[in-house]
């Protein structure tokens, strides 16, 4: 249920008002990230989530709640409460592994997701690329970065091959291997977009694995694999710029050195793939 309030509340207030019988599970963090934590009562478990990006507009967090409200429980956690800076969703039991599942199994999950009704809002990358440029450390902004940004702005985003609801953050840490099959968590970037964009954004280990995933998906979607792979490749420069910009943005936001290393590595990949 959505609960509208302009006044943020504390964690203790949230629990006492809405979940008075639940208590935090302090020793459990499998599959949790950011400010998330687990609460439990008589074997029933919920995940209490906060926005990963404290500077993001509240509307982005609300969209995540709406996306989860639309999705079937077979692929995503069901939400139970939304209010400013807080969301409570089902805990998904299962294993979160350090590597991707079999490509055919993952292709099946993504194809099933892409058959669901659209969310109602489009994923557009250019505004994000420009935001990350503007919000990055001025000392890190380079002529090459600006040149690539202008090039993409002029080229415009590839025309969608098929428009569907997307997760847009598919990696091993966001996949729960449950008894009933694969499920996805962390839907903060979800929206409608090109299915090839989703496939391009999967955090794969190598090109061979990526090609196999695309081939397995193409078989299910009845698309020529070569055609789908060409469309996936069209998105590569956009996604690498998105990743690099996000790492730069997070570096300025947090001061965490890991983001500088990740940004530098992504810039190198972008130069290789040009």
From Swiss-Prot:
This is Thiamine kinase. It is an enzyme of class 2 (transferase). Belongs to the thiamine kinase family. Keywords: ATP-binding, Kinase, Nucleotide-binding, Transferase. Pfam families: APH (PF01636). The keyword Glycosyltransferase does not apply. It comes from Shigella boydii serotype 4 (strain Sb227). The keyword S-adenosyl-L-methionine does not apply. Its EC number is 2.7.1.89. One of its GO terms (molecular function) is ATP binding. Pathway: Cofactor biosynthesis; thiamine diphosphate biosynthesis; thiamine phosphate from thiamine: step 1/1. Catalyzes the ATP-dependent phosphorylation of thiamine to thiamine phosphate. Is involved in thiamine salvage. It comes from the Bacteria. GO terms for biological process: thiamine diphosphate biosynthetic process; thiamine metabolic process. It catalyses: thiamine + ATP = thiamine phosphate + ADP + H(+). The gene is thiK. InterPro entries: Aminoglycoside_PTrfase, Kinase-like_dom_sf, Thiamine_kinase.
């Amino acid at each position: 249920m959505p609960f509208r309030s302009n006044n943020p509340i504390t964690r203790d207030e949230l629990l006492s008002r809405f979940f008075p019988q639940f208590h935090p599970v302090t020793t459990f963090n499998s599959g949790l990230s950011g400010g998330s934590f687990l609460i439990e009562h008589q074997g029933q478990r919920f995940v209490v989530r906060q926005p990963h990006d404290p500077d993001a507009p509240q509307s982005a967090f609300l969209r995540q709640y709406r996306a989860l409200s639309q999705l079937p429980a077979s692929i995503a956690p069901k939400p139970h409460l939304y209010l400013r800076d807080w969301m409570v969703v089902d805990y998904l039991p299962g294993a979160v592994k350090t590597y991707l599942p079999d490509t055919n199994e993952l292709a099946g999950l993504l194809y099933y997701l892409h058959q669901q009704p659209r969310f109602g809002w489009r994923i557009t990358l250019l505004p994000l690329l420009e935001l990350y440029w503007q919000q990055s450390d001025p000392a890190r902004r380079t002529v090459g970065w600006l040149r690539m940004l202008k090039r993409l702005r002029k080229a415009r985003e590839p025309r969608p091959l098929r428009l569907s609801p997307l997760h847009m953050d598919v990696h091993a840490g966001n996949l729960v291997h449950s008894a009933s099959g694969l499920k996805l968590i962390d839907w903060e970037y979800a929206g409608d977009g090109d299915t090839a964009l989703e496939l391009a954004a999967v955090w794969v280990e190598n090109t061979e694995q990526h090609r196999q995933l695309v081939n397995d998906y193409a078989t299910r979607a009845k698309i020529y694999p070569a055609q789908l792979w060409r469309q996936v490749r069209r998105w590569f420069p956009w996604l690498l710029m998105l990743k690099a910009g996000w790492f730069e943005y997070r570096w300025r936001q947090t001061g965490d050195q890991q983001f500088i290393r990740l940004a530098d590595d992504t810039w190198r990949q972008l130069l290789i793939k040009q």
